[in-house]
From Swiss-Prot:
The gene is ipk1. The modification Phosphothreonine is found at T372. It comes from the Eukaryota. Residues 304-314 have a biased composition (Low complexity). Keywords: ATP-binding, Kinase, Nucleotide-binding, Nucleus, Phosphoprotein, Transferase. This is Inositol-pentakisphosphate 2-kinase.
Amino acid sequence: MPLKNYTKTTSKKEPKQLDIAASDQQIEQWSDQIHKLDKAIRSTIDNSRLFYDAWRCMVCIAPSVTASWISLYRQLPPEKQPAASVGTLVDWNKALERQRREVLLALQNFHVIVIAPCKEVKGYVKKAVEMIKRRDKKVKELEKIQKELLVVYELPDPETKKSKIKALQSQLVRVNGELDDLQKHLTLSFPTLIAKSRVFFGQLMKHFYCLQLQMFRKMHNIVRPWDCFQDDIPQTWLVEFSSVCQAAESISLIAVNNNRPPVELPKSGDVLSNREWEAGKIDAMNSLIAQNLHTSASQVSLSPMASTASSSVTNSPVDTHTPSTPIMSRPPSMKALSSGVESQDESVASSNFQVPIISNPLFKSPAPYSPTSVISNHSSTGKSLVISEWAYLASGSANVVFEYVGKNPYFQDKVIRLRRRGQVFTTEQVYEYYQNVIYPLFAGMESFLIEVFLQPVTRDFLLAAQNASGIYLNLNEQYCLVMKDLKDGIEMKPKWLTQSPAAPPDWVVCRTCALSRMRGRPVGFCPLQLDFNNWPKFLCCLQGFVSPDIAMRLFQSGILRKLRDLQEQYSRTDVALAMTLRDVTLYIGKDHITLLDLDPKDMNTKMSKWERDERNLIEGGWYYGRGMKSTDKACRSSIK
């Protein structure tokens, strides 16, 4: 029996055509925006390269110039030398070399974080520019045909006139059809291209200016106007800084609103009053240069309308919001001990367009923390500190950590944590908050909390520690915190284990995943998918992030369940405490799990940022799944 060949016919689906095209006026507006973006991104690439080359040149010639100056200084007669000694100049040169290494480390990834994204945005803009050129070409062709028709209508011969009109009309119909199709395609693709380019460009500008501020602060820490260094070398460096800033200022931000104040260098000798600080009339660069070395940064504050980069100046007078590179190579887990106010993931402001202002606050602000009801007796070690026995380890936005390198058995495997200048809470208040607020919350689970002790410190010790680290400390502190030196482990930030109370009722994505997508960061595991009653589901959620044995330890310990319950309990009654519990770090060692970063939050400086983040998440559609890929799973589907 012969076999029959059966062929399966597949029907091809016609692509869905857009029936409505945007008006010519709207297309012209889009074209104008695209051309401005194209000009801005090209300027960004040129100035970014200038920025990179200028800083490379600066950090390479600075040590040699300083060494030459020291050599000339030594040749001066003693009676003509300034107040500083040669030893002070050598120490200054060593600090400069350390800052130079940090600048070079930060510049290593410059092409990845600035130049490469610039080229990616340029690719988006290039596609739009090509479509604009195609449309302009069709419009000119259409106008040419229309002019030829006007000439043909004036011909005396009817037969010639009729044939030419017929030919031109067919051309007119063809060009009109092509122009309509192109107009529909522009209507479909232009808003997406413009929005994507704007968002990408805004984020790029944010990273570029943060890097610029970081470079400036690391180097300017060395040339800050000391009493004995009012000479030509710092002035020369300030001129170089000015040229770099002017090159960056030539970048046009176009329609992108990143809330960045203008960056200008003040004249030499400018002094800013507290009234100017409070009025918010100064930007990040001015505040950095004009800051008095002998005035505590806690006495001044920026306006709430200032940018994130500007507000970070008072929190971190030397480094930017990112921790500075440690001098000694140590595990990254130690950096968590120094991040006492806020993690980096919660500290970077998002770059958005114009956002409608919500009059009612999204959070209910509780009464500020007051140390009047704290315990009166402090736990003190009773040991004295010698700076030669402590080595700088790491620094964060609020604290600086030193490790013990001496021979006293009491301090073996210990670190001390010193407060940076400009912090709201003192070490004593942080300790009392930890003992009176945090410890009672974890009754029965105290083994997960790190044991801390108050250690008296002197002003001389703080000055020596400040010189050793190159970071300004609060010299009015009377105590520091002593704690165990955690080594050989991994860190994990569980973040929001419950949904934000400000999320819309019909939300699709949890707060943690929504914030990651809004900031363009990889989305990790969803905290809402952690099933504390089902081990297979719990392991499946953490698969790829931690090993199965660590997941089992987390599951059996119950610490994540406890954090979730506490976050839910205080999410509406005590926002500051709830945010502290959401910002904790889990340090997972070989034989223990420890909670870190449980310092109090300053509601006066943090509330506006938290509300701004919630507005951006809600009004940007991030809670509804914006930015999700086809393979991503909705967080709400995991809720029972």
